[in-house]
Amino acid sequence: MKIREKLPDFPVVRADRTTTKTRIVFDASAKFRGKSFNSEALSGLKVQADMFSILVRFRKELVALVGDLSQMYHQLFVTLEDRPLHRFLWRNLDQSKEPEVYEFLRYVFGGCYSLFCAQYVWQKHADDHKAEYSLAAEVVKNSCYMDDLMPSVETVEATKEMRQQLTEIGHKAGFHIRKWIAQTPEAVRATKVDLERREFPVTKILGVVWIV
């Protein structure tokens, strides 16, 4: 018998986001008769570095660089036999219509396995191409948390090379890196001048406020 599952969904609204302010999350942890999709699925191993080590490396060198893997989970296809487990109801916000049944073709935000699978693909490509992209391979292994990249290097020139390598290795893995932010010495000096006027960019790195 083929198992079928309909995943409930809910919106997560983040008004502070510069790109996608509303994200649809599929609740794979919702229980039916005491079980949920996530409780039965294999979540995979932890393959990314721990948060504390990443933050320490991020603060280590003079120039910091931040990037974001755009829609990381949606770059991975769900296998044909697993698609009935990724069903959901949708009526395009029209409450007069009966919901229709769809199947997700890509990995969903909310599945316990999504992070491991995405990180495995990302790290596998980095390892396969580490001879050609040594800087990027090191970043993917030690300075990547979920879909965020946050390395630091000694010089602006090294930052440019690292960004280029990460972009190229991302293309090989099917990932697009966006929202690049770099903290150069020039930016640091400008920040000190503008402290009183509050005219400096502010972002968050793993929940920690970072004044660029």
Residue ranges and their predicted role:
Residues 1-212:
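Conserved acidic
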